[in-house]
Regions:
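Intrinsic, short, N-terminal disordered tails of RNA polymerase sigma-factor systems
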Residues: 1-28, 40, 116
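Short, structured helix-loop boundary elements
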Residues: 24-27, 35-39, 60, 64, ...
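Conserved RNAP core-binding helix
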Residues: 26, 42, 50, 60-77
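A short, charge-rich alpha-helical start-of-domain segment used by transcription regulators
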Residues: 27-51
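Sigma70-family region 2
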Residues: 31-32, 68-86, 104-106
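Structural recognition of an alpha-helix C-terminal capping motif at a helix-to-coil junction
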Residues: 51, 65-72, 84-96
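Arg/Lys-rich amphipathic alpha helix in sigma70-family domain 2
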Residues: 81, 92-113
Length: 116
């Protein structure tokens, strides 16, 4: 029998509780810059998005950097237009952030090779 820890139970209940009405409130709160909405968004998606970032970077530290940069981008430029699910949009932001990170790493490694 699978037993969930209290933290996992809490996360599962938060995810189940994200109905369309709650999602709209969360989106509006993030647009308004409310810290409580930002915290809820981070709590809902950070673990899943860390896995996405890790799949692209292959490095735990880099994945954490990409995750944090992605959430900073989301919180400073909340450009969600409602054309897809919020989770899809957050994933897209993280994937784009991971690809940008990899491009910068590639440019940096080329600079180091060229200088030698």
């Amino acid at each position: 029998m699978l037993r969930l820890t209290n933290k996992r139970r809490e996360e599962a209940s938060v995810k189940r509780a994200l109905t369309l009405e709650n999602e709209i409130e969360l989106i509006e709160g993030c647009r308004a810059g409310k810290d409580s909405a930002r915290k809820e968004l981070y709590t809902l998606y950070s673990k899943q998005m860390l896995a996405v970032c890790y799949r692209y970077t292959g490095d735990v530290d880099a994945a954490h950097d990409v995750l944090h940069d992605g959430f900073i981008k989301i919180f400073t430029h909340f450009a969600f237009r409602g054309e897809c699910a919020l989770s899809t949009w957050v994933t897209r932001v993280m994937v784009t952030q991971a690809i940008d990170y990899l491009r910068k790493q590639q440019r940096f490694s080329q600079l180091v090779v060229n200088e030698e």
